[in-house]
């Protein structure tokens, strides 16, 4: 893509938006119409092909939702190795419980490697419509606690990527039965950390072989009777059932390989990529991402990806930073 032309187009669009907003402000309109955004499709209404390819995830999702329905359960944890789909599963659960009207509100915060109490509170407060930006730590926690425990609404809080014990008191999150209307979901690769917090653990494992192959073909856009079906199954098997690896590799194959010969060459290359002794990085996840990086179409795309990797985890990267 031509980044310069995209940047210029974006600037023109921003200027025209400012002009439109000014005209709206100066006009005497009783109402200004906007196209309503499309809501997320609940998991139960997704396409049949997707559901067939995610049988194990749907089963796990139902288990977690059943636990959330129990009065005695206030804290659950979705645990598993990196790339297995913990965050995706938590988000699907959030969509489904809202669709079923089990909860009135859902708020999610990313904890990442170095969780900051105020940052986590700000993420939750924004989604809950709570203003706490100018308060002291103690007052912020009290206001968050009051918002979550007033009993007027059923609230689901998701804390993603937990790597150490969470100080719920400092955050202002009532747990362990303090509020019947509040439930908390943790996602973490460290089940022992979640166990120490008293969470009910739900382990998420790799996809069974047939589900993994189905997901790979679905991402590539390939039918079972394709001439590439056999080699695609071998590629999918190399991903060892990890959804992240499957999706990353499948997208790269979809873009760059169209013949059995090119697929076989790429398969041999994929088998060579390994990485060891880096905490929190599975060999397979790294090899899949490294392989897909090497198969990006241009040096410009590779440079952009490397630039993005310099920013902190979960950082919202301004577009302008990428085109300077």
Stretches with model-predicted labels:
Residues 21-35, 116, 175, 179-180, ...:
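Proline-centered turn/helix-capping motifs that create local helix->coil transitions or kinks
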Residues 118-127, 180-234, 248, 265, ...:
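Alpha-helical sensor/transducer elements of the RecA-like P-loop NTPase core
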Residues 19-84, 88-97, 101-105, 110-113, ...:
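N-terminal flanking helix/linker immediately upstream of nucleotide/cofactor-binding cores
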Residues 157-159:
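Hydrophobic residues in beta-strands of the RecA-like P-loop NTPase core, especially within AAA+ ATPase
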Residues 1, 43-44, 50, 55-56, ...:
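P-loop NTPase nucleotide-binding module
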Residues 26, 79-81, 109-114, 162, ...:
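Structured beta-strand/turn binding interfaces of compact recognition modules in eukaryotic regulators
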Residues 1, 6-16, 20-23, 27:
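Amphipathic alpha-helices that form helix-helix packing interfaces
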Residues 163-171, 195-198:
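Conserved ATPase-coupling elements of RecA-like P-loop NTPase cores
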């Amino acid at each position: 893509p031509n980044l310069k032309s995209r940047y210029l187009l974006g600037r023109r669009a921003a200027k025209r938006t400012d002009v439109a907003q000014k005209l709206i402000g100066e006009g005497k309109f009783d109402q200004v119409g906007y196209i309503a955004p499309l809501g997320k499709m609940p998991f139960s209404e997704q396409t049949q092909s997707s559901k067939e390819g995610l049988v194990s995830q749907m089963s796990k999702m139902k288990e977690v939702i059943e636990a959330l329905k129990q009065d005695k359960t206030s804290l659950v944890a979705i645990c598993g190795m990196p790339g297995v789909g913990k965050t995706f599963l938590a988000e699907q659960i959030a969509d489904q419980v809202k669709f079923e009207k089990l909860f009135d509100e859902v708020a999610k915060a990313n904890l990442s490697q170095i969780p900051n109490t105020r940052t986590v509170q700000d993420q939750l407060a924004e989604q809950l419509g709570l203003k706490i930006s100018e308060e002291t730590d103690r007052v912020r926690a009290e206001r968050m606690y009051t918002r979550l425990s007033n009993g007027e609404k059923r609230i689901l809080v998701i804390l993603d990527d937990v790597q150490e014990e969470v100080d719920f008191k400092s955050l202002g999150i009532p747990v362990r039965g303090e509020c019947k209307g509040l439930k908390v979901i943790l996602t973490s690769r460290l089940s022992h950390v979640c166990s120490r917090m008293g969470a009910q653990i739900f382990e998420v494992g790799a996809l069974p072989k047939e589900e993994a192959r189905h997901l790979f073909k679905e991402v590539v856009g390939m039918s079972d009777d394709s001439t590439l079906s056999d080699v695609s199954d071998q590629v999918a098997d190399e991903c060892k059932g990890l959804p992240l690896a499957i999706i990353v590799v499948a997208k790269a194959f979809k873009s760059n390989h169209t013949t059995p010969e090119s697929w076989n060459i790429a398969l041999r290359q994929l088998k060579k990529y390994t990485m060891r002794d880096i905490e929190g990085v599975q060999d397979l996840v790294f090899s899949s991402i490294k392989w897909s990086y090497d198969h990006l179409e241009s040096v410009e795309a590779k440079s952009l990806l490397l630039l993005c990797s310099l920013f902190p985890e979960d950082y919202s990267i301004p577009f302008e930073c990428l085109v300077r």
